[in-house]
Amino acid sequence: MSSEMLPAFIETSNVDKKQGINEDQEESQKPRLGEGCEPISKRQMKKLIKQKQWEEQRELRKQKRKEKRKRKKLERQCQMEPNSDGHDRKRVRRDVVHSTLRLIIDCSFDHLMVLKDIKKLHKQIQRCYAENRRALHPVQFYLTSHGGQLKKNMDENDKGWVNWKDIHIKPEHYSELIKKEDLIYLTSDSPNILKELDESKAYVIGGLVDHNHHKGLTYKQASDYGINHAQLPLGNFVKMNSRKVLAVNHVFEIILEYLETRDWQEAFFTILPQRKGAVPTDKACESASHDNQSVRMEEGGSDSDSSEEEYSRNELDSPHEEKQDKENHTESTVNSLPH
């Protein structure tokens, strides 16, 4: 090997050695199985893959939302017609007639609920607001005793509530805003059955998600304040598998539906969720009569079976008694809100 080639050979060898050292350092820096890093399970790997796909499709989802907004805008424009002057174009709307009936959600039970239930109440209020905005006969909507956890949750998760229209959101108690003689508290514990709605009155719905921890509380409050109270005529038209306590938004929507149809049974069956197992009272009576006949036919057995037959009849009379005491009357379903 000549003396001229020797420096080049030495320089090349040094470069190779440096590259080898760097590769060794990189390998040593990688986490090894069993050395401070646990192996990734298949489930974790799937989650990571899904997360990566979600991030990669972010722009695609954004584009789809943009296209959806454009499509809805075009649909709205197609529903427009020129006015008598021929200048502006107005949306073709149904004939909306505002009701004079005042419907109040009483939020004075804030201190009795945990945060999870506060969030459920917030969603139910959102649903009430959305349904009232699209109703044919919207009511005069009031939210009273607004504050505490509920207001904080709305401030954090739904800042747009300050721009809601056609709603009176007040920190005061409803008794400070409306005359006592105009108030009717809607509570399932009241012995009074509501036959029809008086649109000159103000009906109060208890804003309480209690999971049956505070039975009779709204009825007690109405009695303590000395205001009228009543319950919806649910038992006159509907037989349910569960207790007659309904979620705030269900009561609200039933009243909106009744104002449109003036038919309690239609209002109940339009609004009540299927999980309630609601059937018309006449069909429920026919079913009960058929069951009783079946029991009587079986009573022709020996006397030793009489105790079992009596137990069977008791079960038929109240098959859902335990379920009624345990069922939670709330529902978290939320629509996007118009502002």
Curated annotation (Swiss-Prot):
The keyword Oxidoreductase does not apply. Keywords: Coiled coil, Diabetes mellitus, Disease variant, Dwarfism, Intellectual disability, Methyltransferase, Nucleus, Phosphoprotein, S-adenosyl-L-methionine, Transferase. Residues 89-279 form the SAM-dependent MTase TRM10-type domain. It catalyses: guanosine(9) in tRNA + S-adenosyl-L-methionine = N(1)-methylguanosine(9) in tRNA + S-adenosyl-L-homocysteine + H(+). The keyword Transmembrane helix does not apply. CDD domains: Trm10euk_A. The modification Phosphoserine is found at residue 336. Residues 61-74 have a biased composition (Basic residues). GO terms for molecular function: RNA binding; tRNA (guanosine(9)-N1)-methyltransferase activity; tRNA binding. It holds the Pfam family tRNA_m1G_MT. Its EC number is 2.1.1.221. Residues 1-90, 282-339 are annotated as: Disordered. One of its GO terms (cellular component) is actin cytoskeleton. Its main location: nucleus. It is found in: Nucleus; Nucleus, Nucleolus. Residues 52-81 form a coiled coil. Residues 300-309 have a biased composition (Acidic residues). It is an enzyme of class 2 (transferase). One of its GO terms (biological process) is tRNA methylation. InterPro entries: MT_TRM10-typ, MT_TRM10-typ_sf, TRM10/TRM10A, tRNA_m1G_MeTrfase_euk, tRNA_MeTrfase_TRMD/TRM10. It is linked to Microcephaly, short stature, and impaired glucose metabolism 1: An autosomal recessive disease characterized by microcephaly, intellectual disability, short stature, and disturbed glucose metabolism. Additional clinical features include delayed puberty, hypoglycemia-related seizures, hyperinsulinemic hypoglycemia, and early-onset diabetes. Interacts with tRNA. Belongs to the class IV-like SAM-binding methyltransferase superfamily. TRM10 family. This is tRNA methyltransferase 10 homolog A. It comes from Homo sapiens.
